[in-house]
């Protein structure tokens, strides 16, 4: 029957609608959607410590990193595949690869030696029979240091080509170890000398495939190369090896003495003709090296030859204005098809001029071509580099951040090229490989990415090869700050360790760095709730700007351009490594800056000590003046702004709730018990982006607390077992007026939801579902950020695997 228009009909329809809405609300719960995980693309972002190629299997390449695990190259998809994302937060130390070993007789076998730091007992061997698709994990009886000094050397781990289950491992502090059961158990080679040499230990182990029982081992001391010809029963120092510095290498001995009494063997490669090529330096690296060389040992005649690239044997000649020690050598690779064709790379010639060079030889090192010089446009003044146009994937997708915006050096490796239009040829280029299946294809890693060429032979004609970025799929950055505005062109703003920060409209494409000032770390970000185009950021700079504070800046155009604050707050200056936290009110006019900050990754950044001299400073004139507030007299990291109501700031610090309604000039204090909060050290207030005065607090094992009246009365909204170490909000579900909650922690005291992970709630904490799974743990999640415009999306900040965005599968 057709409905009639009239009061009775309207009331009936209203009653039906109301009834349906009531039923919907009563039945509302968090839907357990499936998720997909993708990287927020930087492409690289960290140090590539090794690139290892299988000697016979085409396109089987692995890249190891110091804090991001290992990747395998997938030629079909033209990208690197991360292999260690299953590592949990509890096993964070395992997300760093000390060494990679491949079985020359079985390309499916892969061995990874995992462990970041020597101060952790948690190290292990990951053993795969399927190229890293799955692993068996065996605890290691010794420590590893994938992010320690000497991580540039290797490989420390090697498979015996004559006994497929036998591996040898040169350790840092436990001597030479042998496993005869595929890395499950280990025994010490008790007769090996120099077991704990130099505090760094053994750098590399090489089996001679021509002679069963012959093994060469390189130790990080002068004269540190040893050989056994009876599988380790007896050892001798390789005779004739360099133990003192060649006078030709000591470029400026009066001004800068080597740090060791003689050359230390960094890497070794045994060519098929029996030539053992060795690179040398005066320190373990990857930083602090000042001298070094390259030698070759004829294993048949026992003769050593100095083949170091220098003035009389390389073309073009070394840069004539070089006024500092020439650095050492580390990276090396030999062509599998021609044992006299090899590349070597210098180490630590930074800051230049005459930066680190890659050299190519066709005659076993008698003569060299300087690949870096030949690849650099003329007129660079010795600052070798690629034209920025070459900083792109093979398909032409640009990786623009590698310019570093040509900003002033901040005092660390990887600073921008001083030549506008160039990106540095590289630094820490200790990982280099000539592809065994294609001698023209060469890859080299840097402190930031992987470069490659398919026509290295152009160097033979004194021409530049064509270079491109081959790092797609590798995401090794450390997340320090995340923000997702509720409007504008950018869905995500990021702050990263070592490489500044970025704004993303397209999450799948590399972006330019934020403009000057370039921050070596970007630790703090915020946006104005009612004017999301206004953004502020802060981080260490290291450059003494005379026209303002280089540690903090604001943007009025969504991050396209930036202006430095006129001055820094008291206690923050050029030498500050931790700039604290910064927040901006909803109108974009009031800014507070606290010198205290939270250490998300204790091994990577420290907490700036809090002081009781002042609370968070406030400015209304973009840093011309800073005012100390009343009512809050401690520098706290737990401060944020209301996203809707201007001039309103919140803080929960040392068991006290603070509320400011005058732009941070004064705060009213409420003891936790008075407003319904538990006794707790403090937490960052999370403000609703749509409703003034609505806030959430994630209080660890105490769960989540919620207020709708600016914190004057709080209610616990979670049940027993909910642990919220990190908390964020995002866009609500369809037809819901409530934002979605995300936590890092646990959502129950037992059962499936009691596992540590990332969880989502669509009904303000009543019910939860897990977002990630055991395959997507990334060594732990340090920070999370919901997206105010995309339901279900959450950004995951990691400590070595970059930033991941998790979306509900369509």
Curated annotation (Swiss-Prot):
Its EC number is 3.2.1.150. Optimum temperature is 42 degrees Celsius. Optimum pH 3.0. Residues 1-28 form the signal peptide. GO terms for molecular function: oligoxyloglucan reducing-end-specific cellobiohydrolase activity. The active site is at residues 66, 498. One of its GO terms (cellular component) is extracellular region. It comes from the Eukaryota. Keywords: Carbohydrate metabolism, Cell wall biogenesis/degradation, Glycoprotein, Glycosidase, Hydrolase, Polysaccharide degradation, Repeat, Secreted, Signal. GO terms for biological process: cell wall organization; polysaccharide catabolic process; xyloglucan metabolic process. InterPro entries: WD40/YVTN_repeat-like_dom_sf, Xyloglucanase_GH74. Glycans are attached at residues 32, 188, 298, 312, 321, 455, 544, 573, 612, 638. It catalyses: Hydrolysis of cellobiose from the reducing end of xyloglucans consisting of a beta-(1->4)-linked glucan carrying alpha-D-xylosyl groups on O-6 of the glucose residues. To be a substrate, the first residue must be unsubstituted, the second residue may bear a xylosyl group, whether further glycosylated or not, and the third residue, which becomes the new terminus by the action of the enzyme, is preferably xylosylated, but this xylose residue must not be further substituted. BNR repeats lie at residues 126-135, 226-236, 359-369, 554-564, 617-626, 658-667, 705-716, 759-769. It is found in: Secreted. The keyword Glycoprotein applies. Oligoxyloglucan-reducing end-specific xyloglucanase involved in degradation of xyloglucans. Releases the first two glycosyl segments from oligoxyloglucans. Active against cotton xyloglucan, tamarind xyloglucan and tamarind xyloglucan oligomers. Belongs to the glycosyl hydrolase 74 family. This is Oligoxyloglucan-reducing end-specific xyloglucanase. It comes from Emericella nidulans (strain FGSC A4 / ATCC 38163 / CBS 112.46 / NRRL 194 / M139) (Aspergillus nidulans). The gene is xgcA.
